[in-house]
Amino acid sequence: AAAGDNFMRF
């Protein structure tokens, strides 16, 4: 999981 993907997760 990339940093950008983690942001979209929230």
Swiss-Prot record:
Similarity remark: Belongs to the FARP (FMRFamide related peptide) family.
Subcellular location: Secreted
Keywords: Amidation, Neuropeptide, Secreted
UniProt GO cellular component terms: extracellular region
Stated name of the protein: FMRFamide-16
A Gene Ontology biological process term: neuropeptide signaling pathway
Modification sites for Phenylalanine amide: 10
Source organism, top-level taxon: Eukaryota
Main location, first listed in the record: secreted
